[in-house]
């Protein structure tokens, strides 16, 4: 009985995700990853020539500046990219 109770407690802790962690989409939005500590933004990177097709997605600490060839879109909520 104690083993069952301990197992339930562990499963509950894992499912509740103690401490806030940001989740960002990977390149294919069906999949996401949990961001490590310190990376509190999600980003989506586009080539300026093809703005509708993201090239890269993930977690980042500071939103990079856009350039003539590359545009970044950053946000700070779960799976916002």
Curated annotation (Swiss-Prot):
Keyword tags: Cardiotoxin, Cytolysis, Disulfide bond, Membrane, Secreted, Signal, Target cell membrane, Target membrane, Toxin
Subcellular location: Secreted; Target cell membrane
Disulfide bond residue pairs: 24-42, 35-59, 63-74, 75-80
First-listed, main subcellular location of the protein, grouped into a coarse class: secreted
PROSITE patterns: SNAKE_TOXIN
InterPro entries: Cytotoxin_Cobra, Snake_3FTx, Snake_toxin-like_sf, Snake_toxin_con_site, Toxin_cobra-type
Pfam families per UniProt: Toxin_cobra-type (PF21947)
Signal peptide bounds: 1-21
GO molecular function list: toxin activity
Tissue specificity: Expressed by the venom gland.
GO biological process: killing of cells of another organism
GO annotation, cellular component aspect: extracellular region; membrane; other organism cell membrane
Subunit structure: Monomer in solution; Homodimer and oligomer in the presence of negatively charged lipids forming a pore with a size ranging between 20 and 30 Angstroms.
Protein family per UniProt: Belongs to the three-finger toxin family. Short-chain subfamily. Type IA cytotoxin sub-subfamily.
Task performed by this protein: Shows cytolytic activity on many different cells by forming pore in lipid membranes. In vivo, increases heart rate or kills the animal by cardiac arrest. In addition, it binds to heparin with high affinity, interacts with Kv channel-interacting protein 1 (KCNIP1) in a calcium-independent manner, and binds to integrin alpha-V/beta-3 (ITGAV/ITGB3) with moderate affinity.
This protein's name: Cytotoxin 3a
The species this protein was found in: Naja atra (Chinese cobra)
Lineage: Eukaryota, Metazoa, Chordata, Craniata, Vertebrata
């Amino acid at each position: 009985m104690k083993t069952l109770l301990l197992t339930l407690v562990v499963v509950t802790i894992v499912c509740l995700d103690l401490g806030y962690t940001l989740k960002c989409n990977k390149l294919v939005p069906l999949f996401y990853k949990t961001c490590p500590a310190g990376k509190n933004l999600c980003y989506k990177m586009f080539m300026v020539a093809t703005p509708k097709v993201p090239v890269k997605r993930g977690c980042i600490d500071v939103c990079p500046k856009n350039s003539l060839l590359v545009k970044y879109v950053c946000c700070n909520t779960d799976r916002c990219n």
